[in-house]
């Protein structure tokens, strides 16, 4: 992506490549950032707090979500307080359950009630959304992240689930809570997310790189595809006749 586009929805960058995060921030291409342990591992991050410190020094004024890494709620709470202290623009990512399937609702209620900005992650079902909506403070900024892309990979249409989530947030009401479309798989998800009522869509760098293709004529894409396949055939030296 070479310039920021007004797509009617906030665009967040999802990843943990510090140089890429700095680049898209400096070029004004996104509205915020999300990270997770997978991206940290992929980027070879060995010191989480040092990484976060470097990110926040470079990006002081856009929302950034950092995830807790423990699995028991006592440790999650301790980590959440530490992560929250890293900066005013930090949202603490807390999974909707731990790895045993135990609900994080009580902890979410406690921390949100204290004014801690949270990003509730790994949400897949309307029941999970309903639980989270019921415990978030209406006074505290928060994000509800529905993993629409991964829902789609199970053969389930994510759009009705995301629409229900948007309705629940509106009717609670939670004026400072934003709905985020997570695990983005393709550029078209932007328009699906907007249609469903999402405030934010987060996407990895490979999807961000494709945003300049929005609006390209399909005839042009068709011709480019033919040229690409022809070039592949020529370079491979294939012969039929």
Regions found by a protein language model. Give the residues of each.
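Catalytic alpha/beta core domains of metabolic enzymes, predominantly
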Residues: 102, 109, 116-209, 215-236
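C-terminal extensions of enzymes
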Residues: 240-241
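Active-site beta->alpha loop and helix N-cap motifs at the rims of alpha/beta catalytic domains
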Residues: 2-110, 114, 148-151
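Flexible domain-boundary/linker segments
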Residues: 41, 50, 128, 210-211
């Amino acid at each position: 992506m070479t310039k920021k586009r007004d797509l009617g929805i906030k665009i967040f960058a999802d990843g943990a490549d510090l140089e890429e995060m700095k680049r898209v921030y400096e070029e004004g291409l996104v509205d915020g950032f999300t990270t997770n342990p997978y991206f940290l591992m992929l980027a070879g991050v060995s010191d989480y707090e040092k990484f976060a410190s470097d990110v926040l020094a470079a990006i002081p004024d856009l929302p950034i979500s950092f995830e807790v890494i423990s699995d028991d709620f006592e440790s999650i709470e301790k980590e959440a307080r530490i992560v929250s202290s890293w900066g005013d623009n930090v949202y603490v990512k807390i999974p909707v359950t731990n790895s045993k399937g135990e609900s994080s609702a009580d902890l979410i209620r406690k921390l949100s009630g204290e004014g801690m900005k949270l990003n509730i992650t790994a949400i897949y079902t309307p029941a999970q959304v309903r639980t989270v909506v019921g415990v978030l403070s209406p006074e505290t900024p928060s994000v509800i992240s529905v993993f629409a892309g991964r829902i789609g990979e199970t053969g389930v249409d994510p759009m009705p689930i995301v629409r229900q989530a948007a309705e629940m947030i509106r009717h609670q009401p939670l004026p400072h809570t934003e709905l985020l479309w997570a695990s983005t798989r393709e550029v078209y998800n932007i328009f699906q997310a907007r249609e469903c009522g999402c405030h934010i869509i987060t996407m990895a760098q490979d999807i961000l790189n494709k945003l300049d293709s929005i609006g390209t004529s399909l005839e042009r894409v068709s011709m480019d595809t033919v040229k690409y396949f022809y070039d592949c055939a020529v370079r491979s030296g294939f012969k039929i006749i």
